[in-house]
């Protein structure tokens, strides 16, 4: 990541967890943008055009599934890969996220930030 840093948008109302992921991503050389709810997440995605979005599901204003649908319905954001990062681990939730266009679905309790960073790098074809 020589000159321009790759931008990752984290949309999560959990400031503590979001901060942990942001720190790990920044240490790996990414530029991180954070949003605390679905509405702000959509606005940030439109404005910043990140290379990747980490998206929580349970959030105020708009939930992650609705944010994902709107991102995928908009020509400007439809090609941004989205990884769902949530505590919702029911089979139906996972299937819904993937069917709606997420490239991966990570359950927070099952992954540490380093593993999420590895998945981001894999999706973006980064070393």
Segments the model singles out, each with a brief description of its role:
Residues 48-54:
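Active-site beta3 strand of CheY-like receiver
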Residues 59:
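Receiver (REC) domain active-site loop signature in two-component systems and cognate sites
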Residues 1-7, 114-127:
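Non-catalytic signal-transmission and effector/linker regions of two-component phosphorelay proteins
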Residues 29-36, 44:
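Short hydrophobic/Thr-rich beta-strand motif most characteristic of the beta2 strand and flanking loop
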Residues 4-16, 21-25, 53:
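Conserved acidic segment of CheY-like receiver
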Residues 56, 86:
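Active-site residues of response regulator receiver
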